[in-house]
Amino acid sequence: MSSSQDYNNNSNNTPARVSSRKGKNLHVAHRRSPSELTNLMVEQYNLQRQLEEVQAQQKLLEEKQKQQQQQFTYPSAQGSSELAPPPISSGYGGNRSSHSRSSSINTHRRTGSGSGGTAHGHSRRHSLGLNEAIKAAANQKQSNRNSLSPTIPNEAKTDSSDDIGSFKFPPSGGDQGDTSGQSSSSHNRSRSLAYGQQSFKFPPTPDQSNDTRGNSLLPPNPNFSVTQSPDRGHNRRSSHFRTGSRGSGSNTNTDGINSNWRAQQQSPQQQQRQGGLLEPPQVGFTPGHKPRNSSYGGGSSVSSLQQFLPNNGGSNNSGQQGGHQGGGNNGRKTLFAPYLPQSSLPELINEGRLVTGTLRVNKKNRSDAYVSTDGLLDADIFICGSKDRNRALEGDLVAVELLIVDEVWESKKEKEEKKRRKDNTLHSRPLTDDIHNDATSAPNTAEGSVTGTSKEDGAGSNEEETGGLARRGSLKQRPTMKKNDDVEVEGQSLLLVEEEEINDEIKPLYAGHVVAVVDRIPGQLFAGTLGLLRPAQAAQAARDKKNGKESTVQNPKAPKIVWFKPTDKKVPLIAIPTEQAPKDFVENHEKYADRLFVASIKRWPITSLHPFGTLVSNLGPIDSPETEIDSILRDNNFLCDEYPDDDNDDIVSVNAYDLPSIEPEFENTQREEYLNDYIIAFTQNGEFVDHALHVKRISNTKIELGFHVADIAYFIKPGSSLDRKSKKRSSSVFLPQKTVNLFPKQVNKIVSFKENEKNLAVSVVFEIDTSNFEVEDLYIHESVIVPKQLVTYDAFDTILSGQSVDSISSATSDYVKTFSLIAKEFRRHRLSNRSLGITPNLTLLDQLDDEKVRLDLNIFKDSLAFDVISEISHKVNSAIAAKVHAGLGDQAILRRHPLPTLQKMETFVRKATSLGFKIDTTTSSTLQNSILKIDDPVKRKCVETLLYKCMSRGRYYVAGKQDTDSYAHYYFNLPLYTHFTAPLRRYADLIVHRQLKAVLNKQVEDKDLDSLKAITDYCNFKKDCAANAQEQAIHLLLSQTINEMSETAGQLLCMGTVVQVYESSFDVFIPEFGVEKRVHGDQLPLVKAEFDKNERILELWWEKGVDSATYIPPDEKSSLSYRNSIKNKYRTSALQAAKIQSKTALEKSTTPADSVAEKLAKLNLEPPKLVVPSLKSNELHEVEKDETKSMPSSPTQSEIPKNVRTNSSSRISSSGNTFSLEPYLQNTITRIEGDSYIQVIKELTQVPVLLRAEIGMALPCLTVRVLNPFAEEQ
């Protein structure tokens, strides 16, 4: 058997090993269902319980000694028996005595078995090394196996490896050896394997009222010091640190999450017992598996963890834990596995039994997720279902145990089968379908009974699959609630979210489950709405009300909690205590339906499907412009409360921030002076000026290029109030509607470069050989500069376009052009391409490292000024990175960009190849050059978009905390990189400035790497938040703009380029707006759809005479439809929309677009240029501008399949009308077969689409439909 077969199909009890890309051995565990516990988890829980029991004994002894000292006498026999340690063994009754081990705490090794047996060879769960996992993943990609992993044979081994399996302890009075024997003799997985350290740390003393073990959401401190209390991790986020001030836990005898909320809060000690008395696993909990009497017998389940809860029913802590004894918890079922002890993680990770990575929630199916391991594995780890995700949130650093892929996949299929049976759709949907992702390409042929029938409800055809047609004659129908969810997920972003296609043909390469949250950024905030009912209950109530029925959902009269629904779809529903809601919320909750609130997550018990949180603030009405922007900022963790008086110039004075005087520093002889050089300072938005350039010739073959950056480190001293506040904000946020600067306005004003005045700077000077533009010498020093002129990026762009600017001198213009020439040569060197110019650029990919400052509604819009300055900045940042790393070594703070995983890169290459482009992925430079060679700008942007979704963002890191082979910045193709050139908008630049000064002044001090890593992690988090906020704000403004532009017609008619084709949908890119959207077949008046996977062609079989512009699918008329929850405006027919747009273009009449242009002009933005095509050679007219913009090239006749012809005879014709749809439809590929009207959708062709903005939600949504070429003329 190959290693891959071992990994995916290992069914014996012999552990196997594989190695990672970095040569590290990893283990892969067996598990039959998500409810089972792996050997590793059971082992750790058992060890932890034993440690806690020993600690409890020590506590009892301390109490006894203390009492003896107080009484000055020995206690009576009865008192002595009460204070003495409990018997060694433990049972599972109401009062469980502590289990004592003869060995000390220090001898409790993680590899030791809980029953005293050997540490190695547990037969219930087996870990495979990473070498085999990697090989298995490789073979998995090549073999496309559809068979399931063989059934794991039943075994009844009784060796010491089985001792861990049962974890049953002998009756009272037995010795430790009996414990082992009892465990071995009752090795039954049907027993519950519970454990009590729900917060995964050693328990505090019983009198500690701030114990957060049981249900604490926040992870322990990421510092893996065994001697450090995990409680320190909670101290970072005081709002999530629970206390015991609410009293004892005697009132926890409740029924569910609604009525038990306060009881859970009353005593933190209760929280750690929350999973204490749990229900036994029910019959059939793992459907599809035969009863197992071997080491897998019955399955040790998460839902029955009672026997491992320390102090379960113990009398010593009855006052704090009594609510969880003998039914005090009312048998609440444990839904999630408690996290492993934080102190055990380092050893487990080093041994390869766990891997760490960052969790990314699948936005289309939020119960699933992926974990990126930062290059350890060549693909992300698939996390299947909420149970395996185990309460981890987006962006968490998690510890994951790898699992057998086939076992996880089989479990997922069983879950989907249950879901379909529940929905009574098993007869109509193949089991291989992924209802969460309709962007799939089904296998060419059905296999066995697994795929079921190929026909969907309402498909309107009895044809079966033939040849290369996948599900011929079917149209994938999404459930209504799923359609509504897709509208928000797809509509609330400019580009479609990345989706991994997984099915029987394309399985994940790795699978796993989260066993601990290693780190989480504290203080995360979420914007959303507040409701009295869960969303599903609210939808049911709305449906009953519309149908005139008596509601089956009753509003609770005195609810303990209300529900917070975050705007971010990746954040779970949050339970909020009712007393935190507005006072009249319960009685008048309807009036708050259109208001936005801000909340944070406080804790997530293992017995609750949802986390509990705190309501932070009431932002205001959803449709308020101020609320919309505040919501975006809060949702991305920018409270903007660091400088409360910043907007009041009367209050804030120059000296308010205790900045040092500048004048004395001008006399510092250690600073180089650049007083006579022609230095030009640049500003992107006019609010601050933090960089300047000069160039001069120093010989016939050499030039000097200087890059000067504002000396922020001189003004902001470490530990100062301003330093702390700027560290908290960490990054500026640039939105079209608002700018949130890193520093107060007065500080920006003082630090910024001023024209014809002395300014403090840090200068990087290159001596360049003009024959080959190689850097021959480099100088870095603190300096004093005098900029001769200040130039905006807008003026820079104007100069490079060949026009003159009145306020710019001819000398400055010449220097600006010289900078452009130098930048072009730098770019040629960096990308190893001597034929490159300064354009074209991959503008979207550039935003992977840094967000824009000068914004536009189209995220693809380029700026030559930005390109030139950025290219020179790359050279400077790379030089600073080398200098700091050479001087500080492991302490250097640098920036990297990781390579895409092999799986993602292969997916991208496959997609690009199907589009007809050859991609060379040898290096980053060859990859970018392959895309830059694409002449058609629209097609190039399509390919760029595909690559963008395969890439992750750049990350700050501490050199000593990162493997040396991952230092490089992949996208910039540079071995070392950092951020140095923008200190007024990035806190990380300030840190790098300080490090550089320490190197220059030879004042290097040893810094704690963990504290530096904490800074880089937080900077990464806030920088990602700033980028997300910018994207959301642009999307908001673009949606509002499209809504106003389409006020008359209700939608805009434009041309879209098909990027990807799937079995029942296709993606289009609309270049005028820079958006990518999905066209769903079930939103169109179609008879059926046929997908040819081999040719990548989707055929739409239209209903003749039905206009897709006004068509409403039947299910959208129900109360579940999202369209009933918003104010839906009037929509005209497609023909009327075309007439309106054409008339506007010809007459240049006053339209809503005029007011749109005025509004955007106030924000320094240009309105979108909507192109109205004319027939063939006629000129194109623009709605917004007089200048002409050409459309992407149309497909040639050779691109049309042989059996397809262009036929417009049955489509809408102009027939005397001046305005018609014919210009939009002239290049569509159609055919007529009898009574069937067919349109062919092929990748990279243009199709007319109707773009519509849905206004009225927390975030607006952009939706698209394709035009029906066979609609009747109206």
UniProtKB/Swiss-Prot annotation:
Name the UniProt record assigns to this protein: Virulence protein SSD1
GO CC terms, sorted: cellular bud neck; cytoplasmic stress granule; nucleus; P-body
Annotated CSD2 domain residues: 562-637
Biological processes annotated in GO: intracellular mRNA localization; mRNA catabolic process; regulation of fungal-type cell wall organization; regulation of G1 to G0 transition; symbiont-mediated evasion of host immune response
Extent of Basic and acidic residues compositional bias: 413-437, 1178-1189
Domain DIS3L2 C-terminal, first and last residues per copy: 1050-1136
Similarity comment text for this entry: Belongs to the RNR ribonuclease family.
Domain RNB: 688-1001
Record's function text: Plays a role in resistance to host antimicrobial peptides such as protamine, RP-1, or human beta-defensin-2; allowing colonization of human tissues. Required for resistance to membrane permeabilization and maintenance of mitochondrial membrane potential upon exposure to RP-1.
Induction trigger: Constitutively expressed and not cell-cycle regulated like its S.cerevisiae ortholog.
Stored InterPro entries: Dis3_CSD2 (IPR041505), Dis3l2-like_C (IPR041093), NA-bd_OB-fold (IPR012340), RNase_II/R (IPR001900), RNR_Ribonuclease (IPR050180)
Comp. bias regions, Gly residues: 320-330
Keyword Translocase annotated: no
Domain of life the protein comes from: Eukaryota
Biased composition (Low complexity): 1-13, 95-106, 177-187, 264-282
Cited Pfam families: Dis3l2_C_term, OB_Dis3, RNB
Polar residues bias locations: 72-81, 139-152, 248-263, 438-453, 1190-1207
Matches recorded under SUPFAM superfamilies: Nucleic acid-binding proteins
Keyword check for Cytoplasm: no
Lineage: Eukaryota, Fungi, Dikarya, Ascomycota, Saccharomycotina
GO molecular function, one term: mRNA regulatory element binding translation repressor activity
Region (Disordered): 1-38, 61-124, 138-337, 413-488, 1174-1217
KO phenotype (gene knockout): Decreases virulence in murine infection models.
Key words, A-Z: Virulence
Biased composition (Basic residues): 19-32
